[in-house]
């Protein structure tokens, strides 16, 4: 695992956690300049998903422990804020719930918070990885490639969203993602599903803000209310992580929930 730091260390710290199978630069590169105006910004690059090291993603809890140790060693055990994109929301939830470090503001970025028993997680992983791994590494089959190309060329709002979302996933970036192993992807996908983040999380001194993408459906709102005792639900009439695709608006909303003045 690597953690990349940007900006003035005297400013409040915010740590960003990428989504499933995402590369840190394509996931968050477009928001770093805006964040650095207000925050000492740190971006997590998970084991097995960083191009500067030869490593394997073992499990979600293994990565959480590494992050906890980093925060203890480098940041006196405290973060002002943490943002979790999709999968990253599970990391933020675990870090808060385990209480080995303290986070003032935990921000959940329209995470699906899917949970499954280990047997089902393994089954879903066995189904998904043969399709998803070639897609991420740029070796997708003709059929899968055509499906995504069709969705991105429909000429409507959904196709524009899909195009931008694919950029966050690294598609079209020109980056060779062959450094990501199938084992890392499998372990990340499976352990995220079968690692419980807990229920009704309520930690003194911590506020949990949820960027709820309304177009995902009401069942996700119910999941957030089950996971967190008293979440600050920030509702947007958007799709999964669509807010993050608009860098200026996203930075504005992050600052707003953290009580920091930022003008669009």
Feature annotation, model-predicted:
Residues 4-53:
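Conserved HGGG/HGGXW glycine-rich cap/lid loop of the alpha/beta-hydrolase fold
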Residues 33, 207-241:
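Conserved loop-alpha-helix segment in the C-terminal half of the alpha/beta-hydrolase fold
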Residues 42-81:
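Active-site loop/oxyanion-hole signature of alpha/beta-hydrolase fold enzymes
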Residues 82-84, 109:
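Short beta-strand immediately N-terminal to the catalytic nucleophile in serine-hydrolase-like folds
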Residues 84-92:
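Gly/Ala-rich beta-loop-alpha elbow adjacent to hydrolase catalytic centers
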Residues 97, 105-137:
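Flexible "cap/lid" loop of the alpha/beta hydrolase fold
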Residues 179-223:
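Conserved serine/cysteine hydrolase catalytic core
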Residues 229-264:
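Catalytic active-site module of serine/aspartate enzymes centered on a nucleophile-bearing elbow/loop
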